Amino acid sequence: MSSSSGDCIFCNKKNCKVISSTKYFFIIRDTAYPVTKHHTLIITNRHVDDFFDLTKDEMSDLDEVLKEQKKQLKKLDEEISAFNVGVNIGKDAGQSIMHCHIHLIPRRKGDVEDPRGGVRGVIPDKQKYKRK
């Protein structure tokens, strides 16, 4: 779905301190529910619910935005040693704001005891596994 919603906090940029923008996206730091320091949200300018509905031009721009934000974040904080990139698509996957946004989560050595499994942790029983 891609119709604008009058009460969408991202369409209204409610409580959004925009740090950068492109033709297709605006970028903010997640200050409401950050997973780590400098957790970044890359949000579509147009109202579109589903990541899979992004256009080729939007996907191409997103690639550049992610690379640029990675570079900026590493300049901002030299302790950043890795990243998680995540998208929740649909309520059953945890999407709570029905406006497409991508999480860029900076990671630091030792920020969790055992980072193996990374995004597999969305289903806790699947995070730990042994390679075959």
Where are these regions (language model features)?
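HIT superfamily nucleotide-processing domains
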Residues: 1-132
